[in-house]
Regions:
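N-terminal signal peptide c-region/cleavage motif recognized by signal peptidases
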Residues: 15-17
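Mature extracellular catalytic domain of secreted serine hydrolases
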Residues: 77-95, 171-180, 208, 219-223, ...
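Alpha/beta-hydrolase fold nucleophile elbow
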Residues: 202-214
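Non-catalytic accessory segments of hydrolases
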Residues: 19-185, 206
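Alpha/beta-hydrolase active-site loop
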Residues: 104, 177-201, 259-264
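Short, well-ordered amphipathic alpha-helices
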Residues: 108-110, 190-199, 221-225, 266-271
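Glycine-rich nucleophile elbow surrounding the catalytic serine of serine-hydrolase chemistry
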Residues: 131, 213-223
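Sec-dependent signal peptide recognition
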Residues: 2-11
């Protein structure tokens, strides 16, 4: 009997010390679907929420399109980071030449697991990685959420040639904002639009949004400070180890022509990757 009691007591102590992920059955209906969170590290996690239409087919190398699908139930997806080379240095793991998916415009939200008496400040994280690698899941902001009573949003955005690419086969066949080369920047702006529209449902204050990022993410923060499309979508900005350059639009296009991605991609191949209609 003493041994049985000791085993039971030991089991209870060990079990109570393990951080077990729990389910939160309350569904939140957003503009892109309904989602329930799960509790882990003392915060509620809402993961893999689509914030724009998948940039596939006719939407490849175009500005992100607003998503509106309130009737769908959002479920977590495996491998939804944007296409990149596998990397163990702040990027997505994997084997081979490439990992990831073009269908990658998703965001995660972390909120305190407590009853809120007021709307909380919102912080939107932009990951680094040279704008060629990285993903929304690389850091865990649970401690920040718990310690400072904030809501943290992390996002994926298109990388590499899918995110920043100037080519006659693209620009000559597009109009308006679709003619831009800065698709990754526009993804971040679309994520901010989604947050402004939906974050109050999660207890966040749409009038108190801070963008923050490190390295290339810090560079993207600086880009958003001057992008007219982002005006009014955030209120504070933190650039960690960010960098920026000053160049004209014309000179930027000249630099792009010298880039190997441009020189090694023919008009014919690029056009075949862009269907004629949406």
């Amino acid at each position: 009997m003493p041994n049985k009691f000791l085993y039971t007591l030991t089991f209870l102590i060990l079990f109570s010390s393990i951080n077990v992920a729990g389910k939160n059955d309350d569904y939140i209906k957003t503009s892109s679907g309904s989602i329930s969170g799960y509790i882990e590290n003392k915060v509620i996690n809402y993961v893999d929420i689509p914030y724009a239409k998948p940039p596939l087919g006719s939407l490849r190398w175009k500005a992100p399109r607003e998503i509106s699908n309130q009737d769908q139930i959002i479920s977590s997806k495996v491998g939804n980071h944007c296409i990149q080379e596998p990397s163990s240095m702040g990027g997505a793991p994997g084997e081979g030449i490439l990992t990831g998916n073009e269908d990658c415009l998703y965001l995660d939200i972390k909120t305190p697991n407590k009853k809120l008496s007021k709307l909380l400040p919102v912080m939107l994280w932009i990951h680094g990685g040279g704008n060629t690698s990285g993903l929304k899941d690389i850091y865990d902001f649970s401690t920040m959420v718990n310690r400072h009573d904030v809501i943290v949003v992390t996002i994926n955005y298109r990388l590499g040639a899918f995110g920043w690419f100037t080519h006659p086969a693209i620009q000559d066949n597009h109009k308006g904002i679709d003619k831009t080369s800065n698709f990754g920047t526009l993804d971040i702006i679309e994520a901010l639009r989604w947050v402004n529209k939906n974050i109050e449902l999660f207890g966040g204050d749409p009038n108190n949004i801070t963008i923050f990022g490190e390295s290339a993410g810090g560079h993207n923060v600086l880009s958003l400070l001057v992008a007219p499309q982002s005006k009014g979508l955030f209120h504070k900005a933190i650039s960690q180890s960010g960098y920026t350059t000053s160049t004209s639009k014309e000179h930027a296009h000249i630099n792009n022509i010298d880039h190997p991605t441009y020189n090694h991609t023919s008009n014919e191949v690029t056009k075949r990757l862009i269907p004629d209609s949406e």
